[in-house]
Each structure stands twice: as C-alpha cells, then as structure tokens.
C-alpha cells in the first residue's frame, strides 16, 4: 500500500490521503498529519491532542469517551451509527461507493481503481 494516493470523487481531482508507514497525510504536499495509529488508537493532528478513533473489536468509536459508534464493519459493508441505519461505504468489485444507492464513487486509488482486496487491506491496516 505504501505511498498510494487517495482521490476523492469520480474524476479523481483531489488528493485526500497519502499513506506512508503508519502516518496518513492530507493533501498532495503532506502538510498535515490526520491519523497516526498507535496501538488501538488513532489521533488527529501532529500533537495527538485528540483521540479521533478507538478501535475495539469490530467497532470504531468517535472521541475519547467512546460515546458514539462511528463505523461498524459487517462483512463488506460499513455502517454509520449504532442502529446501522445508513450504509456509508459499500465496496463491490473495484469501486468504493458512497450511500445506500451506490450513486457516487467515494474513493479511487492512483494507478488504478481500489480493488476489493485493497479495500480489505485498507480496513485491516486501519484496524491493526
């Protein structure tokens, strides 16, 4: 996975994240650290001032108090909220779709589409 670049939208016009080691940067110039995975915690910002995600089992919580379930990975689907009322991402074949109607491509790899294997690898990398 190394130094692949994430693009947002079907036209791949905007770089979202660049994964290098365990650091994820925002933008093409890598000027800001978004996530730094340390154990089971992911921090926002270079000073690690705020806990953004805390992965426990297959649940991902938002905030330090783990008061809200942000994502719950169930098979190939990722759901938002505790009631799983809305499908946030559903990857099928080599595309990652946003929303329940799969109307928009949410993410695409540089140098090819995001495959199902790469999507699984990305989720695995973020959870380990």
Give residue spans per PLM region.
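Long terminal segments
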Residues: 1-23, 27-32, 38-40, 46-50, ...
């Amino acid at each position: 996975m190394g130094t692949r670049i994430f693009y947002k939208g079907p036209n791949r016009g905007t770089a979202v994240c660049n994964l290098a080691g365990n650091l994820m940067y925002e933008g093409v110039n890598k000027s800001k650290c978004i996530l730094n995975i340390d154990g089971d915690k992911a921090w926002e910002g270079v000073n690690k001032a705020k806990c953004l995600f805390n992965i426990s089992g297959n649940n991902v919580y938002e905030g330090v108090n783990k008061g809200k379930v942000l994502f719950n990975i169930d098979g190939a689907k990722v759901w938002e909220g505790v009631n799983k009322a809305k499908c946030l991402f559903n990857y099928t074949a080599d595309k990652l779709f946003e929303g329940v109607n799969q109307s928009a491509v949410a993410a695409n790899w540089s140098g090819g589409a995001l495959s199902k294997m790469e999507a699984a690898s990305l989720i695995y990398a973020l959870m380990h």
